[in-house]
Each structure stands twice: as structure tokens, then as C-alpha cells.
Design a protein with these regions (language model features):
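Short catalytic helix/loop segments, enriched in acidic residues and glycine
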Residues: 30-48
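Conserved N-proximal alpha/beta basic substrate-recognition cap immediately N-terminal to
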Residues: 41, 57-185
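Short internal beta-strands
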Residues: 45-59
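Active-site nucleotide/adenylate-binding loops and adjacent lid/helix of ATP-dependent enzymes
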Residues: 136, 151-245, 295-304
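Phosphate-binding site of ATP-dependent enzymes
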Residues: 204-206, 223-281, 328-341
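Glycine-rich phosphate/pyrophosphate-binding beta-alpha loops
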Residues: 282-283, 341-355
């Protein structure tokens, strides 16, 4: 089987990994103009026969680069949403409202076979797209994600925290705060949140406040005693219209923050752990990348807790991917758990793309008798705006080479024009992966030091 062939038994997939489906005002503002380009990530997942839907055209030179590695869809299977549609439309809406695009998608899919819609997150937008493909195009489509109502339930961090505690998963000390006010309006009074933070600060010097419906770090606030961070946090919360519940917890010092990626299928198939990675977080605890393999000493316990949560989710009708965050606590904690459950993302997350890319590449490496990829580190790197062609020209000797079984694979190329290069460094060892990424970062135009 060549690198560009797909197993005949594999059902075709329609990838629609647009983060615009996350309908949170603060998240959209946080991501800014880069948000429509997030759907590009699914190019790493697609195989021949799959469709990849994006909001914006993709650089042809990047598609060619992926093709040489045996990754990505066929060029004719890249579906660009209607660029004349309202800017308020999410990708799934653009596709659903464009009959020509729907019919073109249907024509690219095999007849009389089930097709899976693989979204970034399952929402009502994706559910409506499935119905449109079924009723208007006659395509047998199943959404490989939980129903929107189930996603909404598991997006509420305070409810998931309560579930985790009921299952016996270790959680940080803290409380849930409810703010008064009508939906989609700023809170009437933030005094309850202020009081909760002050109570927490009377017991510990470091507190974390998290909006209970948030994504990508857009709702995370760090409050330290005697720094003015309490006032700035309250001022920011007072402006927000998309949350009424906040978690106020002790900010426990962590040696590492592992993420467990699960796939939860319908029974009787077993729940699978796709992989455990260490999150790369900035000083504000915002996700910037992932490392594999994990360095946590608690890997077995963390995976066991994740699977326990996954089984309950499946019993409640959950089907699809889920990312579960933990921290490994810095010692000494002799009388307490060495790890804590932090939160659940009822969708794929940033770790999924490098994990899947490593698995795909290793399948091809194995068939060709080439070196196995044992480690990776992914990172979002600040730079000056740059094109993919210019980036490839300046880093060609560092890009992934199947013969070596190592190198750097840039992706999410739409973000390059905004001064962010996202890349996966793959290698035989974690040390080599870090070395390659540092070398790659040093060639970026801004030449900023990589932390």
C-alpha cells in the first residue's frame, strides 16, 4: 500500500474542525483573527477519500508538502466554505446554506456507504449540517461526536467537577460561585466572586479562577495575594456576558500537567486511551503545545481516573473524543493525592493533532522499514508574519524526513500571517525533539528565545 492509499474498509470522513463552533464571546475575542484558520488542523488527520472543510483557502505549497509525507486529503477534496457568507456564520452554517457546496461534497463521497462527520466539537451547527447532507443530498452521515446537549452538559466545568468528586477523583480545594443576572448580559453584582476569592486567599497565597464555560484559556484568571490581580480579575469578569458560574480554587504547584485523550465509542467497543501528553503552558496557564511521552510519575493513576470518568460519560450517551486535564502535584504531599483532576474538554483538543500525526507517520514508517517516531513536542511559536514557502526554504534541513524518522512539521499555516507558527517536532527521543524545535525556532524571522 502506498503512502497515499487508504484502507478500503475505512469509512470516509468529513472533517470540519472549525473552532468557530465554540459559541463563546470571550473565546472568539481571545482568538481574534486567527480563529477562522483553526479548521486547517484537520489536514493532518485526513486520508485519501476524506473531505476536509475549511473557512479559508489553504496554501497549495503546504498541501504539496503534506502530500509528500503521505498526509492530507486529495486536493479536490478540500472544501472551502462560502467566503461571501455572513461573518457571523460558523463553518458548518456556511456549508449548510450553500447548495452547490453540499452537492459537490456529496458527489465526492461514495454512494451506499456510511460517512462520518468528524467535527472539532459537536454542536447544533454540526447536527444541522448532518441533516442537510442526509435530506438534501441523500448521504448516509453519522456524526462522530456526542450530541450537542451532551456536549453542553460536559462543557460546564462546575458540573464536571461535581461528577469527578462523586467518582472519587481528587480535586483541588475550592468552591463554585454563581453570579446573578440575565443570560447574555454582564453580571449585576460580582461581590459573591470577590468574597469567594478573598476566602481562598485567606488560606493560600495563590488562587485560580475559571469561568465554567470557557475554552483555550480564555476564562482562566490567576490571583495572587497582594499583587493587584484580584482587582484586575474582577474588572474583567464584570465585562463578560457569557458566564454566570465561576470556579475558585487553590492553585496547587504542579510539576507537570498531563492530558489524557480518550475515544469513547458506542458499546461494546472498549474506550481507548489515544495517548497521555504533558501540556506546555505559559505563565498564565494557557495551552501552547504538548510533549510526548509524558513524564508524570502518576501516569497509571491518571489514566485509570480518566477511564473511570469516560465510562460514566458513555453511560450518559457520550460518543466521540474527550480530553481530560490533570496536574501532578509538586512534592511533598505525603497525606494527599499526588495528582488532581482539573477539567474535561468534550471534544478533540490540541494534543490530538500531534498524537494522530505521529500514529499516521509511524504506520508508514513501519511499512517502509524506516525509523520509529517515539517522541514529539508541539508548540506555538511567535514570529514575524511569514509564508509557508519562505519558512520551508529557511528550515528545509530541519523539516520532517521519513528516512531519518525525525524533523519538524509546521501546520495551521493560516496563522503564519498573524505572527504565529505552530509546529510538531518528531524524533526518536524527547531530547532530540526539543533540540530540533529549538533549532527550528532560532530560524524564525523574529529570532525570539524559546522558553
Amino acid at each position: 500500500m502506498s503512502a497515499r492509499q487508504s484502507p478500503a474498509s475505512r469509512a470516509p470522513r468529513i472533517y470540519a474542525h472549525a473552532a468557530t463552533s465554540i459559541d463563546l464571546e470571550s473565546y472568539r475575542a481571545y482568538k481574534g483573527p486567527r480563529l477562522p484558520y483553526q479548521a486547517e488542523r484537520a489536514l493532518l488527520l485526513a486520508q485519501p477519500g476524506d473531505l476536509v472543510c475549511v473557512d479559508e483557502p489553504v496554501d497549495p505549497s503546504f498541501l504539496e508538502f503534506l502530500s509528500r509525507l503521505g498526509l492530507g486529503p486529495l486536493p479536490e477534496h478540500l472544501v472551502v466554505g462560502d467566503r461571501c457568507a455572513s461573518g457571523d456564520f460558523v463553518l458548518a452554517e456556511k456549508l449548510r446554506h450553500d447548495d452547490a457546496t453540499l452537492l459537490s461534497m456529496a458527489a465526492s463521497l461514495p454512494k451506499h456507504r456510511v460517512v462520518y462527520l468528524d467535527p472539532f466539537i459537536g454542536t447544533s451547527y454540526e447536527e444541522q449540517l448532518v441533516r442537510a447532507l442526509q435530506t438534501r443530498c441523500g448521504v448516509q452521515v453519522i456524526m462522530d461526536a456526542p450530541r450537542a446537549a451532551i456536549v453542553e452538559r460536559y462543557n460546564r466545568k462546575h458540573e464536571v467537577r461535581q461528577l469527578a468528586a462523586a467518582l472519587g477523583l481528587p480535586i483541588a480545594d475550592g468552591e463554585v460561585v454563581a453570579l446573578d443576572g440575565p443570560p447574555d448580559h454582564t453580571p449585576r453584582d460580582i461581590t459573591p466572586l470577590e468574597s469567594a476569592i478573598e476566602r481562598a486567599l485567606s488560606k493560600t497565597a495563590h488562587v485560580i479562577v475559571r469561568a465554567c464555560e470557557s475554552a483555550g484559556g480564555s476564562g482562566t484568571f490567576l490571583v495572587d495575594r497582594n499583587t493587584g490581580s484580584l482587582e484586575s480579575t474582577l474588572a474583567e469578569v464584570a465585562k463578560r456576558r457569557d458566564n454566570r458560574f465561576y470556579l475558585v480554587e487553590e492553585r496547587v504547584a504542579a510539576s507537570v500537567s498531563p492530558n489524557v485523550m480518550l475515544h469513547i465509542p458506542l458499546p461494546p467497543e472498549p474506550i481507548r486511551c489515544i495517548g497521555v501528553t504533558d501540556q506546555v503552558l505559559d505563565e498564565g496557564l494557557v495551552h501552547k503545545g504538548n510533549r510526548f511521552p509524558t513524564t508524570t510519575r502518576c501516569a497509571d493513576a491518571i489514566e485509570r481516573d480518566a477511564l473511570r470518568l469516560g465510562r460514566v460519560m458513555r453511560d450518559e450517551g457520550y460518543r466521540g473524543f474527550a480530553g481530560i486535564d490533570f496536574i501532578e502535584c509538586e512534592p511533598p504531599r505525603s497525606s494527599r493525592s499526588q495528582h488532581l483532576f482539573i477539567e474535561l474538554n468534550p471534544r478533540v483538543n490540541g494534543a490530538f493533532y500531534p498524537l494522530s500525526t505521529r500514529a499516521r507517520l509511524n504506520e508508514m514508517q513501519d511499512r517502509r522499514g524506516q525509523p520509529t517516531i517515539n517522541a514529539f513536542v508541539s508548540r506555538s511559536l511567535p514570529t514575524q508574519p511569514i509564508s509557508f514557502e519562505a519558512l520551508a526554504a529557511s528550515t528545509r534541513d530541519l523539516l520532517f524526513d521519513p528516512e531519518r524518522g525525525s524533523g519538524v512539521l509546521p501546520y495551521k499555516t493560516g496563522g503564519f500571517e498573524f505572527g504565529f507558527v505552530t509546529a510538531i517536532s518528531l524524533a526518536a527521543s524527547p531530547e532530540e525533539a526539543e533540540r530540533l524545535l529549538l533549532a527550528f525556532a532560532s530560524r524564525l524571522p523574529a529570532r525570539r528565545a524559546l522558553e
